[in-house]
Amino acid sequence: MDGRTPRPQDAPARRKPKAKAPLPPAETKYTDVSSAADSVESTAFIMEQKENMIDKDVELSVVLPGDIIKSTTVHGSKPMMDLLIFLCAQYHLNPSSYTIDLLSAEQNHIKFKPNTPIGMLEVEKVILKPKMLDKKKPTPIIPEKTVRVVINFKKTQKTIVRVSPHASLQELAPIICSKCEFDPLHTLLLKDYQSQEPLDLTKSLNDLGLRELYAMDVNRESCQISQNLDIMKEKENKGFFSFFQRSKKKRDQTASAPATPLVNKHRPTFTRSNTISKPYISNTLPSDAPKKRRAPLPPMPASQSVPQDLAHIQERPASCIVKSMSVDETDKSPCEAGRVRAGSLQLSSMSAGNSSLRRTKRKAPSPPSKIPPHQSDENSRVTALQPVDGVPPDSASEANSPEELSSPAGISSDYSLEEIDEKEELSEVPKVEAENISPKSQDIPFVSTDIINTLKNDPDSALGNGSGEFSQNSMEEKQETKSTDGQEPHSVVYDTSNGKKVVDSIRNLKSLGPNQENVVQNEIIVYPENTEDNMKNGVKKTEINVEGVAKNNNIDMEVERPSNSEAHETDTAISYKENHLAASSVPDQKLNQPSAEKTKDAAIQTTPSCNSFDGKHQDHNLSDSKVEECVQTSNNNISTQHSCLSSQDSVNTSREFRSQGTLIIHSEDPLTVKDPICAHGNDDLLPPVDRIDKNSTASYLKNYPLYRQDYNPKPKPSNEITREYIPKIGMTTYKIVPPKSLEISKDWQSETIEYKDDQDMHALGKKHTHENVKETAIQTEDSAISESPEEPLPNLKPKPNLRTEHQVPSSVSSPDDAMVSPLKPAPKMTRDTGTAPFAPNLEEINNILESKFKSRASNAQAKPSSFFLQMQKRVSGHYVTSAAAKSVHAAPNPAPKELTNKEAERDMLPSPEQTLSPLSKMPHSVPQPLVEKTDDDVIGQAPAEASPPPIAPKPVTIPASQVSTQNLKTLKTFGAPRPYSSSGPSPFALAVVKRSQSFSKERTESPSASALVQPPANTEEGKTHSVNKFVDIPQLGVSDKENNSAHNEQNSQIPTPTDGPSFTVMRQSSLTFQSSDPEQMRQSLLTAIRSGEAAAKLKRVTIPSNTISVNGRSRLSHSMSPDAQDGH
């Protein structure tokens, strides 16, 4: 015991820090007792008691929820939580729903922890108390099955209600009525509106098998109100519908005007044109432009009517004729513009809404949409109409042109004319032209419209002879358009002309209802005889008459228009020539563009297609003729110029112009044969075959020589690749001449330029003679060559030159014929004689040109690229047109003659360069005659002398560098981005040209023959023009050489009889094929005609444009490029 005690005492001391291991109870007892430690003893005692309590069972009374008392026994060691589970299980209760309350013997609540053993608590009663159920959410009610029921009411309204399908309709009625806002007392439930039998309200929806009801308010007032509301709604709907229809119509009309480049045929019906134009508008024109043009569209059906024209006078400037005339006779333009605008009325009307729009989008050939019917009738009806009324005929022609909405140039032309009218100043006109050039799309559409009308009027002519003539018309229209609008409208006209000679033909028919040729001659002579005002009318009328004369001479007619316009404008041969040169130069440049249309298509769509080239070329020739005629007869300067222009306007006219007395003969001759085309039609027809456009460009050289040269260097690859580019409808219609023509033109130009330099030095007569000889050989070949630009490559020097010379003779011959015609019909006959061996060839060429024209028109490959280029260079084309117009104004006044001389010299110098660029060649070639007259016309030094030759574009062609400089200036003036501004053809273009030449040999042989026929006359004219221009007449050889150098460079070396003609012919042939869009060619021609008046006024300011052309060949190319592209 003693031993134990000390141990326990020590132990507790030791274990206190731990305080966990109590001593054994016995020992503790003993220890506690012995030690008498109260704490230790008490603790030990409590623990012992607890242990004893835990070890034993405990009896409990359990109070269940229903105050049911149950007794149970549990082991004292069971924790309280376990006790709850145990009791709930014993009495089938949910432990989660109950809690345990403990009561002691004294009925006190005992607090416990869930893990406290029940034995340690002095528990007497356990109460199972349910937890607080109030906090719980009430159990969800099972949803009642419902269905969706559609309730129709008030005829047009419906609502949806969800109701029980088993409930009777009587129970559902209040719900339905409240939903429909009806009075349940006056509401009937029907199966549907038609059935008047009310439903049985005692049945449920399931019983009726319905899920849709009609609730009818039987109240009279509500019924009446509902009926009235329905009526009012119907009226409102109708009103809205009609309003939308109106607005839609307006939109469509507006859209149709700008978007009818290729929709010209659909133009007759607003719906068609609108629908077609809409996409175009959205793509090419701003929505505002269409809106503004909406108003003009209604007049478009009466596009021929003067009031409509007057209404659109300001817009009409795009149609160069009115404006150029207006420029000379400031206030004569309203009527004139009306006339001119008749063709491009819709175009101008569409552009009228927006001056800016007008500038940028003269394309809305709204009038053309309505003229398609005219186009078919124009051949017979318009011819009679236009000769009768100077204004109405032109209006008819232009209305026809607008009909052909597909030609955007028309719009631009209209705009140009309008602006020219407004400004009435040559300097102002160039600005307008620049503006118009920027709105190239508008200009082009208008020209295209004219061409389209011409094509429609004379589809056959457009194809063969018409191909060249169409080019002439295109040239004329482009001249007008370019005078006023720059070159854009011309290009469109060219395209349209290529596609359709109807417009010009219509004009011709109108002018020459009974006897197209004679009427043209007579009217042409009569109008030229009149004063400037009369000339204005004469130009328009003559243009129309010429149109009548030229189904085949559609181009001539258009040329006549510009020429007359120019003559009228300047009042003197020089002034007129300047204007004509401005117009002619523009077309010529455009013609050059088609030659290098690939190069210049974007920049100038002046010669969208070969017809456009022809138109320009013929225009150029006409210009030359008129200038020459004016040179010969200063007294008859204006009238003679006018008649010359009229004569030259049509292929016959060019012939007629050579000998005014012989005008009728020649007019008919060109119509029947390509011999007249040789003088003028030849220029135009062959230029289409042989890229007459270059000749036209030469003609334009005065105003737009740069275009031509630039056009030469600017044979665009696309043009070269696809020689048969057709202007797109929606686009500004920059028609890209098929690559073959362009390549051929390039090759021809390069070679022709070389030959031109060499052969240009040779007497033009030699060139003429050689051309006749070569034309004989080459026209056979060049028929194929014109057909396919490949031939020029093989015959690059002989045939391309021949073609070029052919083209130049076309260009020069036309002027020469014009000169000879005024001077003597014999020279014209000599020309023809020179080309006599080719007179049949001309017919062949006409046939070939027709076939080529068709093939080009059918050539869809060129179109895409052309369209793309058009889109690309649309603005530039507009600028080009404006620049052309400006150039026309500036060039004649400042120093056209000097420029012409410089150009001639430069032409001789850049011969190789121009040879490289067929465009330049053609322009040079064309400008030769025009240069001769460009001195007078552009320089205004020898108005009588130089006024006749419309081939004055030579100055532009002459200096390649000068032309480039001017081209740059022109481009700057135009503000048109020129995709291709190369002064020479690109290697690709050359390659294409070579390949095209190889193909063209076979295809364009007949066209080549035609071209050859033309070149002699052109050469003579070119000679005469050169003499007039440089040495008046003494230096015919030298001047001719210079002019021919430029002319040949532009017209692929007109001076070189042997090589030049071949080259020219090939180029012309290719040009003819390039103008595959007759409508656009037509419109280009119409635009040229329109711009003729504007050009006449612009001619005074033409020197700047000439300078641009001469100094900046590339610039001219730039300007031409858009038109060329436009044309193609």
UniProtKB/Swiss-Prot annotation:
Sequence motif KKRRAP 2, location on chain: 360-365
Signal peptide: none
The entry's keywords: Phosphoprotein, Repeat
Motif (KKRRAP 1): 291-296
Annotated WH2 domain residues: 1081-1101
GO molecular function, one term: cadherin binding
Biased amino acid composition, Acidic residues: 416-425
Any single GO CC term annotated in Swiss-Prot or TrEMBL for this entry: extracellular exosome
In-chain residues carrying the UniProt-annotated modification Phosphothreonine: 139, 260, 284
InterPro entries: COBL-like (IPR039895), Cordon-bleu_ubiquitin_domain (IPR019025), WH2_dom (IPR003124)
Biased composition (Polar residues): 270-286, 345-357, 397-415, 1045-1081, 1103-1122
PANTHER family xrefs: CORDON-BLEU, CORDON-BLEU PROTEIN-LIKE 1
Record protein name field: Cordon-bleu protein-like 1
Originating species: Homo sapiens (Human)
Lineage: Eukaryota, Metazoa, Chordata, Craniata, Vertebrata
